[in-house]
Regions:
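Second-shell loop/turn segments in exported
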Residues: 42-52, 68-69, 134-139
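Positively charged n-region of N-terminal signal peptides that target proteins for export
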Residues: 1-4
Length: 162
């Protein structure tokens, strides 16, 4: 009976698992994105690791410039914020096969990055969100951040499809 309960619980979590690499994006269809030329940063939920925060800001600045937006210290046409979250997913199949007394549960860290653009009235104009498994090798973090940020900005309303 316990096995059946664990199996059902596994299906529940599997069915709700996000697809890494997929981008979910929304935008205000009434907004004139071609008229937006400048942006300023506002606070979101910064990355826990300060180096990652700096990399995310740089990657978003690069991609924003790629869609024709110029960063201003204050007073931009819009504000941009980013939000991050990291969760550790436990590999339940591997967990059942291992010696539970001497080994830690196998996990994979799943990072989530959300970029939100708002107008002067704080109305959301565009948002994009993606998830990506994070390599435990911190040296690979800059490339992962850049790849995910590029992926997010492919959904920006004025960006021509490639």
């Amino acid at each position: 009976m316990k096995s059946v309960a664990m199996l059902l619980l596994g299906f529940l979590f599997t069915a709700q698992q996000p697809v890494p690499g997929k981008v979910d994006s929304t935008f205000d269809k009434q907004a004139n994105f071609a008229a937006i030329k400048t942006y300023s940063w506002t606070t979101g939920t910064d990355a826990f690791v300060p180096e990652a925060h700096t990399m995310i800001i740089a990657a978003i600045d690069k991609e924003a410039a790629g869609v024709g937006l110029k960063r201003l210290a204050t007073g931009g046409d819009v504000t941009i914020a980013y939000y991050t979250m990291t969760v550790s997913n436990v590999d339940l199949k591997a967990l059942d096969k291992m010696d539970k007394k001497t080994m830690a549960a196998p996990t994979k860290d799943l990072g989530k990055l959300v970029v939100v653009m708002r107008d002067a009235a704080h109305q959301q104009l565009w948002s994009a969100m993606s998830r990506e498994y994070l390599d435990p090798d911190r040296a690979k973090l800059p490339a992962t951040i850049q790849t995910v940020t590029e992926r997010l900005f492919t959904t920006y309303p004025t960006r021509a499809p490639k």
